[in-house]
């Protein structure tokens, strides 16, 4: 919706925004009686192809773009849908373990726990919670991931909060924790979020640096950590941008009125160079 809505604004053609908005509403209207949505839906029939409700991959951008459509276009319906989904997530998926906040994958119709595994992609969610007004939970969830980072140096792709062990030992040079730290810092300017961002950046330099750039890791539990041989495209679009904006205080960016897409594209808040 943010990208398609922006395209409609730039071209003057409302079809792009209407199509994206229609798809978001279609998913929301098929939510369960618990107000949860699942990870997979048949786009032709509208039937669910999964029973799993998660804040991680397959659902993460849906929640993010509901809020973003409110932030970017003042779409009150998207704000309402975001609020309904978030209340349901906090009611049915929120889990506290050893004073750390996590979010279980649950059956979207019964609320029964399906998995206690978290994928690294979900670590963005603390920032989104903060944006939506649940700053206490957003801060707590980000701190939970920061503790995992402290344990392994860099985040594993999968982590089971029930066993406190990685379920996937790779690291894909992902930016989500830095994203959350930057988003939370924009909200309250706490130095803690800069500290988490700094540790994320320094760990990347230490472990992911290769002779000609940066690469993902094959095993974050190995000593020393074992590198793979791949640099994903989102690293260029997101990662370095979050680090830079978190510390640069650049006059080129409006730190109070801005919007970055899920791929880190600045759709609002970029200022011209002053002559």
Regions from the PLM with identified roles:
Residues 1-275:
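Glycan-recognition and catalytic cores of secretory/periplasmic carbohydrate-active enzymes
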């Amino acid at each position: 919706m943010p990208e398609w809505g922006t395209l409609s604004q730039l071209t003057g053609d409302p079809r792009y925004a209407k199509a994206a908005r229609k798809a978001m509403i279609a998913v929301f209207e098929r939510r369960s009686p618990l107000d949860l949505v699942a990870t997979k839906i048949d786009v032709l029939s509208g039937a669910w192809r999964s029973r799993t409700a998660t804040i991680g991959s397959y659902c993460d951008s849906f929640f993010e773009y509901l809020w973003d459509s409110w932030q970017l276009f003042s779409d009150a319906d998207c704000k309402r849908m975001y609020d309904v989904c978030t209340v349901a997530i906090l009611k049915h998926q929120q889990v506290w373990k050893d004073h750390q906040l996590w979010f279980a994958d649950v059956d979207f119709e019964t609320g029964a726990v399906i998995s206690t595994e978290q994928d690294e992609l979900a670590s963005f969610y603390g920032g989104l919670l903060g944006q939506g007004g649940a700053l206490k939970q957003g801060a707590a969830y980000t701190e939970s991931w920061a503790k995992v980072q402290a344990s392994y140096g860099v985040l594993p792709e999968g982590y089971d909060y029930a066993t406190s062990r990685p379920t996937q030992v790779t690291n894909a040079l992902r930016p989500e924790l830095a994203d959350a730290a930057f988003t939370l810092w924009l909200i309250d300017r706490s130095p803690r979020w800069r500290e988490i961002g700094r540790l994320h950046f320094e760990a990347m330099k230490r472990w992911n640096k290769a002779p000609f750039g940066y690469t993902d890791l094959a095993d974050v539990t190995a000593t020393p950590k074992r590198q793979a041989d791949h640099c994903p495209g989102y690293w260029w679009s997101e990662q370095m941008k979050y680090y830079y904006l978190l510390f640069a205080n650049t006059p080129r960016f409006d730190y109070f009125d801005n919007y970055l897409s899920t791929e880190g594209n600045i759709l609002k808040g970029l200022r011209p160079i002053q002559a």
